[in-house]
Amino acid sequence: MVSGHRVGHDALLLAAFAPADRRTAVDLGTGVGSAGLAFLARVPEARATLVEIDPSLAVLAAENAALNSLDGRAQVVTADVATLGRPAGPDVPGKGAADLVLANPPFNADTRHRTSPDEARARAHMADADLLAEWVRAADRCLGAKGVLCLIHRPEALADILAALAKGFGAIEILPVHPRADRPAVRLLVRAVKGRRTPPALLPGLVLAGADGSPTPEAEAVLRDGGALR
C-alpha cells in the first residue's frame, strides 16, 4: 500500500487494474503519483515515468516516491498530457517503448457538474471528448506495440472513451465500479491493447461497500492492501 500526500481511491483502483507483467509504465495525469507508485509497489520489477502538468503536484509526486522508497524506479516529468500525442509534443522518457500507460483524465466537462472554485482543482476536473481523445493519442504515442492502456473515467463518458480508442486500440475490457451492489456504477475502469482488434468485453463489476456501508473484501484487498483486480 502506498502512503503519502492525497492518495485517492481512483488512483488505487487504476493501479490495481494494470496487468502485473508490465515493466515500463507511464502514468499520465499522475497528480501526486498515486497510481504509478501503487503499481510500482505491486510490481517490483517495473519502472515508471510520472507525468503531471501542475508543478506543485509534481513536487508532491517526487516526495511520495521518496517516502515510499520508490524514487529509484520512478521519474517525475512536468508536462501537459494533451500535448504528448502531437507530432511536436514534448519528449517523455520511455515514449514509444512503454508497455503500460495509466491514465486518469480530467472529469466533469459539462454543465451537469459544478466547477471547483479553486482554479487548479477546476483544471484537473474539467474535460470534454476532444481532451479525452488527446489523452488517448498521448497514450498511443507513449506505448510500443501491444502496449496496454488502463484508464479510469465516469460512466457517462463511455461512448467518448470507445470512440477515442477505436482508431488504435482493441481487446477493450470494461470494469464498472459500484458504491454498493444496488447502486449504478460511479466509475469505469477501461483496459485496452494497442494494435489489437478483438471486440470489447464487459467484466463483472467491483462493489466497494456492503449494505451496512463497510468495505467489501474485494475493495479492501485493493484499497487497503494494494492488491490487483482481475
Residue ranges and their predicted role:
Residues 105-134:
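Mobile active-site "lid"/loop adjacent to the S-adenosyl-L-methionine
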Residues 3, 7, 128-185:
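Conserved Class I SAM-dependent methyltransferase catalytic core
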Residues 23-31:
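Conserved class I S-adenosyl-L-methionine
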Residues 61-62:
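Conserved SAM-binding loop
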Residues 47-52:
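Conserved SAM-binding motif I beta-strand of class I
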Residues 70-81:
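Conserved SAM-binding strand-loop segment of SAM-dependent methyltransferases
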Residues 32-45:
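Conserved SAM-binding loop of SAM-dependent methyltransferases across substrates and taxa
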Residues 184-230:
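SAM/dcSAM-binding transferase cores
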